[in-house]
Amino acid sequence: MEIKDLQDYVAIVNDWPKKGIVFKDITPLMNDGEAYRFATDKIVEYAKELKIDIIVGPEARGFIIGCPVAYALGIGFAPVRKPGKLPRETIEMEYDLEYGTNKLSMHSDAIKPGQRVLITDDLLATGGTIEATIKLVEELGGIVAGCAFLIELKELEGHKKLNGYDRLILMQL
């Protein structure tokens, strides 16, 4: 398998979650063990190069990407969730979506100062989610060593919010 083959495992869904949005569905990739392992292995290789201490992923597809990477590396995973979903003290950050606004939260003790962090998510669109996640990590004293995505929607220019941050993007659609 090659990186270019991963595009065969992304389903295009028009008008979801609302009219005018073209959703990129990664569940076909997750349903295929070889494709899922290949994508995960590419991110693991990237994380090893960066000497990552912990993986951070935003709800929910960031979990799907980040948890197997953390497992493969033998390191922890820190979830970033919507407000009210984490049971202990949290910090919050507001962000813009491709189709609205929301907030993200993270346990206030999830990252130790100086930890090298890899942020994982399935998709880089407008960059709002990743920008908020970066701010949460940095507020806790973490060092964002890199960001890894399965897909970038290049026309939405989310990469502009990642200036100065290393990144791995497996597919551009």
UniProtKB/Swiss-Prot annotation:
GO terms for biological process: adenine salvage; AMP salvage; purine ribonucleoside salvage. It is found in: Cytoplasm. Pathway: Purine metabolism; AMP biosynthesis via salvage pathway; AMP from adenine: step 1/1. Its EC number is 2.4.2.7. Pfam families: Pribosyltran. InterPro entries: Ade_phspho_trans, PRibTrfase_dom, PRTase-like, UPRTase/APRTase. GO terms for cellular component: cytoplasm. The keyword Lipid metabolism does not apply. It catalyses: AMP + diphosphate = 5-phospho-alpha-D-ribose 1-diphosphate + adenine. GO terms for molecular function: adenine binding; adenine phosphoribosyltransferase activity; AMP binding. Catalyzes a salvage reaction resulting in the formation of AMP, that is energically less costly than de novo synthesis. Homodimer. Belongs to the purine/pyrimidine phosphoribosyltransferase family. This is Adenine phosphoribosyltransferase. It comes from Listeria welshimeri serovar 6b (strain ATCC 35897 / DSM 20650 / CCUG 15529 / CIP 8149 / NCTC 11857 / SLCC 5334 / V8). The lineage of its organism: Bacteria, Bacillati, Bacillota, Bacilli, Bacillales. The gene is apt.
